[in-house]
Amino acid sequence: MLHDPELHYLDNAATTIVAPEVADVIDKAMREHWANPSSLYAPGARSEEALNAARAAVARTLGCKSKELYFTSCGSEGNNLALLGAAQTRTFGKGIVVSDFEHPSVQRPLERLAAQGYNVTVVNPQADGTLDINKMLDAVDKNTILVACMMVNNEIGTRNDVERLAA
């Protein structure tokens, strides 16, 4: 299916086909580094070495420190960790601005934060499914600690100008 010339796959915003080279690397890692990297035995130590090497490579690519990276098992877990962690470690403000068409893995932690007293402002999309960045920016104030906006909507494929929003 991956190399089917008749296939015109148009759902990469939701799930992307894995490139063969990536599948090979994943397969090798799963075969050679299957052990718990926190264990004391030799296979675990090898898994820890591989994990640390991967973490260092990602850190170099992103221009950050290895200790600043957290690997999660999926995007939903990563979203929960990022949103709850960012909000609950802040020492000022309780304002959060979010677009109305975020993934449930973004919506649910924000509902939890709203129940804890955070002020979650939801900005609706325009008729064409894109986000009015000016409305998002207008919702930001001195108490805003977090803005959540997907770059590409995984259901309708619209792209949002997150570069402008982040500037």
Can you describe what each PLM-predicted range is?
Residues 1-167:
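Pyridoxal 5′-phosphate
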